[in-house]
């Protein structure tokens, strides 16, 4: 989500630190900053591009420093501005910290530290780390960081420097990546290997719970109890361009592989005492209590995620959920009354039609709950409540990990609505438990990548596809068809499986494959009959089904299995498969899936 760089050594110039930080620009960010110790201890940070930061430092770029840390920020707590940019400092301005991740218990820590006399200058969760290290510091920076991280809950990668410790960076990792290496007279760490490659190709990847002491000539790694750890050194053969993509050929491929982490990021801090928890909704639960109808507006992939939410909430409550494509809603007479709830979903928070739909709904008295990935975006600012996806920057035009993240937030929101309206039961407990366990299962799904690529090779030359599904399988079919259209330019259409006989089946023949989304759910046998109908028209069939479902054995065709889960969660479980199938076809056809023709990442015009 953010980018971290740390350097310690001799003969280093500030330009080296800034240039290394620029190697992380591809990750996306809204502000940047550095802290450095040379002839003096300084911090400089600015909202905007690294070029803005660099321009402000232009008189100092040739200044020498001994130790420095740098950061690109993607806002999660506090809007994007100079004050909230990293690094953050302690009260004495002796300690500087950069951080990637989310500190779940930062409010409790902040209250404790304020009672101890600490004064805060930002709205971020990160600043508590600097003050916590200050609170624990008694001359040993490692010891202070070890004590501090034991009090943190959530995900983090941090790098800490102290003005009185000129030869050391202390770094720690839990849930967010950090990699380090030693070059000629320089120790360097970063969020990924890209900034390291100018100095060394021999690197060590920190593991969860690791705390590292980095110096110019070496490093030590400890666990949080202060016991030394051994970590393998890897030799990296990537060049810098490949390293930006983590060694993957395309950003889209990398971002699909980040689906499990995106799910973790969306869930972190949002489950307490085995119940869904949204700090953002603390003062707005009345909005969702006793609601008899909820409206949803969104576009594209976000619309399909909204459909999943509709099915989920209507299957588990008596609440009606009406969902419309934003470009239609904004031009209709809105049947909205004072106090109605409208949920707006947009990765960028800048989708023009969704913004206009929100403005129309607000004129009629609706309260807006938005689900957004970009903090400080227009939709964020114009909403009553914003629930962030926390997926981090997504570079590829086609939504992948943000689809997973918005689904996760919508499931949690649905469960929260169930809880506050008296629908909480043992099945809700089961769904939440399986949702929390889902990241590990998504890792298992991604291990099927070679099989999916083989299937893509087999089907890449077809010119038409029909995706079908029932219930929760239908939004997945819609999203699968959209992915294929977006990046392969193959015509793909999606239907409710029960609609085949009402017209679409006339299209099917040996040159028109059917991609059937059919998890082992209450509608499985209905969908199975539609697949058999399709095969009787000689259509090639791909089935996306569930491991252990022996009824799939009766279907001859290509089958991809995913692990079993609660039937409402299959859209999450199956997302990586439909993404990888489309990605590999695009790649095998020699297309660039990161930049499909005629498409933009954020649709900011009508």
From Swiss-Prot:
Keyword Transferase: yes
GO cellular component, one term: cytosol
Species name: Thermotoga maritima (strain ATCC 43589 / DSM 3109 / JCM 10099 / NBRC 100826 / MSB8)
Compartments it resides in: Cytoplasm
Keyword Nucleotidyltransferase: no
Quaternary assembly: Homodimer.
Keywords: Aminotransferase, Cytoplasm, Glutamine amidotransferase, Repeat, Transferase
Catalytic activity line of the entry: D-fructose 6-phosphate + L-glutamine = D-glucosamine 6-phosphate + L-glutamate
GO molecular function, one term: glutamine-fructose-6-phosphate transaminase (isomerizing) activity
GO biological process: carbohydrate metabolic process; fructose 6-phosphate metabolic process; protein N-linked glycosylation; UDP-N-acetylglucosamine metabolic process
Protein name in UniProt: Glutamine--fructose-6-phosphate aminotransferase [isomerizing]
Catalytic residue positions: 2, 601
């Amino acid at each position: 989500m953010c980018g971290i760089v740390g350097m310690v050594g001799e003969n280093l110039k500030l330009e080296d630190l800034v240039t290394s930080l620029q190697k992380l620009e591809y990750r996306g960010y809204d502000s940047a900053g550095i802290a450095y110790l040379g002839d003096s201890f300084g911090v400089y940070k600015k909202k905007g591009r690294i070029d803005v930061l660099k321009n402000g430092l232009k008189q100092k770029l040739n200044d020498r420093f001994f130790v420095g840390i740098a950061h690109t920020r993607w806002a999660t707590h506090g809007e994007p501005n100079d004050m909230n940019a990293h690094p953050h400092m302690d009260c004495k301005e002796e300690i500087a910290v950069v951080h990637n991740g989310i500190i779940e218990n930062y409010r409790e820590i902040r209250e404790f530290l304020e009672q101890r006399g600490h004064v805060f200058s930002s709205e971020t969760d990160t600043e508590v780390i600097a003050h916590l290290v200050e609170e624990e510091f008694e001359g040993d920076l490692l010891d202070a960081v070890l004590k501090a991280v034991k009090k943190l809950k959530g995900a983090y990668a941090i790098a800490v420097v102290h003005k009185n410790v000129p030869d050391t960076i202390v770094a720690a990792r839990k849930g967010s990546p950090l990699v380090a290496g030693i070059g000629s007279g320089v120790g360097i760490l970063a969020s990924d290997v890209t900034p390291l490659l100018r100095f060394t190709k021999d690197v060590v990847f920190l593991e969860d719970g690791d705390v590292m002491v980095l110096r110019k000539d070496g490093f030590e790694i400890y666990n949080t109890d202060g016991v030394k750890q051994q970590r393998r050194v890897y030799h990296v053969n990537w060049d810098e361009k490949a390293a930006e993509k983590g060694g993957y050929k395309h950003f889209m491929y990398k971002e699909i592989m980040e689906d499990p982490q995106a799910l973790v990021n969306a869930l972190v801090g949002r489950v307490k005492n085995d119940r869904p928890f949204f700090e953002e909704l603390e003062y707005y639960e009345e909005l969702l209590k006793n609601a008899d109808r909820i409206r949803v507006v969104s576009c594209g992939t976000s619309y399909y995620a909204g459909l999943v939410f509709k099915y989920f909430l209507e299957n588990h409550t008596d609440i009606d959920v009406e969902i419309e494509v934003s470009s239609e809603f904004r031009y209709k007479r809105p049947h909205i009354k004072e106090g109605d709830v409208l949920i707006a979903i947009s990765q960028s928070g800048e989708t023009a039609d969704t913004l206009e739909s929100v403005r129309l709904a607000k004129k009629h008295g609706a309260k807006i709950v938005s689900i957004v990935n970009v903090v400080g975006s227009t939709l964020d600012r114009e909403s009553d409540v914003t629930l962030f996806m926390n997926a981090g920057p997504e570079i590829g035009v086609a939504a992948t990990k943000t689809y997973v993240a918005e689904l996760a937030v919508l499931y949690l929101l649905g469960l929260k609505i169930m809880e506050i309206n008296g629908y909480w039961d043992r099945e809700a407990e089961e769904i939440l438990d399986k949702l929390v366990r889902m990241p590990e299962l998504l890792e298992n799904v991604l291990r099927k990548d070679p099989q999916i690529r083989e299937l893509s090779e087999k089907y890449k030359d077809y010119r038409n596809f029909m995706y079908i599904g029932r219930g929760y399988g239908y939004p997945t079919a819609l999203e699968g068809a959209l992915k294929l259209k977006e990046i392969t330019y193959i015509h793909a259409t999606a239907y409710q499986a029960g609609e085949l006989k009402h017209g679409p089946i006339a299209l099917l023949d040996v040159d028109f494959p059917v991609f059937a989304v059919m998890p082992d759910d209450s509608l499985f046998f209905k969908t199975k009959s539609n697949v058999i109908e399709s095969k009787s028209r000689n259509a090639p069939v791909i089935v996306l089904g569930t491991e252990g479902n022996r009824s799939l054995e009766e279907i001859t065709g290509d089958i991809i299995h995913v692990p079993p889960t609660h039937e409402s969660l299959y859209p999450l479980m199956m997302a990586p498969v439909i993404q990888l199938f489309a990605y590999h076809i695009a790649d095998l056809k020699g297309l660039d899936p990161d930049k499909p023709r005629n498409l933009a990442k954020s649709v900011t015009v009508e």
